[in-house]
Amino acid sequence: MKATGDRTKVPTGDPDPCSVSARITEEPIQTDRLLDLGSRADGALLLFVGRVRDHNEGRSVARLRYEAYAEMAERELEAILREAADRCEVTRIEAVHRTGELEIGEASVAIAVASPHRAAAFEASRYVIEEIKKRLPVWKREAYADGSDAWVRAASDGPPR
């Protein structure tokens, strides 16, 4: 499943609207591309990268798998980004979430925010990751070092059926 992506201008109360991009993808996240975000007017460029860690709740994790209905997840991710743009003075905000099989250390989510000021960039980034954790319809299945696996609580009420 390839990323569909969306680039939408969002009114933020300023004469120049914020540009928003939300993507769900099976492809590795190119974090270096996200560092090109923003313009010369931006004093802050913040990049948050969430990575697959080797443990969770006392268990050794070997890898994990994210599953999602990509179109629905992208719509919700875009809504989250729009909310962040409305709340914070940012000029560009982009988020990418992986699906598929991920190994330890791989980027599972990336959020890039460009803003004239650092406080707004930090606020927007924090808002986006917290809302992703609460609301994004993406399911996670952890594979453990002992050979077992389990669905892990995600934003929705349960694993895909």
Describe the residue ranges of each PLM region.
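N-terminal, polar/charged subdomain of small-to-medium soluble alpha/beta proteins
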Residues: 1-108, 114-126, 130-161
